[in-house]
A protein has these predicted regions:
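Conserved ABC transporter NBD signature motif
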Residues: 57-65
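Conserved coupling/switch loops of ABC nucleotide-binding domains, chiefly the family-specific signature
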Residues: 53-58, 211
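The feature captures the beta-strand-to-loop junction immediately N-terminal to the Walker
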Residues: 34-36
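Helix-to-loop junction immediately C-terminal to a conserved catalytic motif
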Residues: 49
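Non-catalytic connector elements of ABC transporters
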Residues: 241, 252-359
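ABC ATPase nucleotide-binding domains
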Residues: 75, 90-228
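A short, flexible loop at the N-terminus of ABC-type nucleotide-binding domains that lies
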Residues: 1-5, 9-20, 68-70
Length: 359
């Protein structure tokens, strides 16, 4: 049976953290809850785990009322943002702890721990003290301890958020393999994150959450290609998708003093005023382009993010190399208009380069 939630609501003081959330999580699948900070991700995971009791709604699993099952009987493993390990135990002992609590045979414990160590890339570290490990290695220990429990539900609450950029990239690539190969077909994996790149890398089903509400549910590729509205477009892109208020006139897209040829997929729009959306990666430096002024330059890993202005227009472009720019430098850019999106004045998707619409 699936893990099914219906109309879950939870209020903290006077603020609603969850607003009638429903879900249907199938066994053997990986799900990503994508949302900004304070969107309700942690609250939802804690509600599933039994650490919080919803004010209304229901959760059923294997045809049982999950809310009536005590926390210790729910067969759930949870990995937190912080590296939660037992400092007085070595790596092997940390991972073996839940198995020893269950009184398993020592040989069985040994086999399961070494299987888990191999899966998370910590072979040879079994005798190390926790204090001797890097942040990434400590989080791998937390994941390994969760895997050996062979829990039916594995919850991961932003497990990469406290790691440095390079380590996040490395673990992001490894985690999908860990979850796909490390769990049985009877398990459900629910991974929460603020980072759309993690959601795309894991490539499971994505639930976009904002202010305690589910905005959109779908395959990672579908969410990325066809965000249903401006909120989803902002949450599912990093940096957020650029949005410009534009007009259409004489087959041109116009804003400020800029005119762009209208691409085929936007040529039949009935409304002459709309929100023009374009990703930072679809704006390129071009010596024959439109001149903008640098407001801020950021280095993000191996990329350079340029915050640019022209009149009242503000945009961000990403360059796939580290470059040196100063504030008020002039740069010229082109928009890849064939990659552009159109959202109506209330924010719904009208047209995407992938054929999607929400009107």
């Amino acid at each position: 049976m699936n893990l099914v939630g219906e109309n879950l609501s939870y209020k903290l003081t006077e603020e609603l953290q969850l607003r009638k959330i429903s879900f249907n999580f199938e066994k053997g699948k990986l799900y990503t809850i994508l949302g900004r900070t304070l969107s309700g991700k942690t609250t939802l995971l804690k509600t599933i785990a039994g650490l919080l009791m919803p004010d209304s709604g229901s959760i059923r699993f294997e045809d049982k009322n999950f809310l009536e099952i005590p926390v210790w009987k729910r067969n759930i493993a949870m990995v937190y943002q912080q590296f939660i390990n037992y400092p007085h135990l070595n790596v092997f002992e940390n991972i073996a702890f839940p198995l020893k609590q269950r009184g398993l045979d020592p040989q069985k414990i040994n086999d399961e721990v070494f299987k888990s160590l191999k899966l998370v890339g910590l072979e040879g570290y079994e005798k190390r003290k926790i204090q001797e490990l890097s942040g990434g290695q400590q989080q791998r220990v937390s994941v390994a301890r969760s895997l050996v429990k062979n829990a039916k539900i594995l919850l991961l609450d932003e497990p990469l958020v406290n790691l440095d950029y390079k380590l996040r990239e490395q673990l992001r690539e490894e985690f999908k393999n860990i979850f796909v190969n490390g769990l049985s077909e009877e398990s459900i994996v629910i991974f929460s994150t603020t980072d759309p790149r993690e959601a795309m890398e894991l490539n499971g089903e994505v639930i976009v959450l904002d202010e305690g509400r589910v905005l959109q549910v779908g395959a990672a590729k579908e969410i990325f290609e066809n965000p249903k509205d401006l909120k989803v477009a902002a949450i599912s892109n990093d940096p957020p998708m650029n949005i410009l208020k534009v007009d259409i006139d004489s087959n041109k897209i116009k804003f400020e003093d800029i005119e762009i040829d209208i691409p085929d997929h936007l040529s039949k729009l009935k409304d002459k005023h709309f929100n023009f959306g374009i990703r930072a990666s679809d704006i390129e430096l071009n010596s024959n382009g439109f001149e903008f002024e640098v407001e801020l330059a950021e280095i993000s890993g191996s990329e350079t993010l340029l915050h640019l202005t022209r009149g009242n227009a503000k945009i961000i472009t990403s360059i796939e190399e580290v470059m040196d720019f100063k504030i008020r430098d002039k740069v010229k850019i082109n928009f890849k208009s064939n990659k552009a999106y159109a959202f109506d004045e209330i924010g719904n998707l009208v047209s995407s380069p992938f054929g999607g619409t929400n009107v």
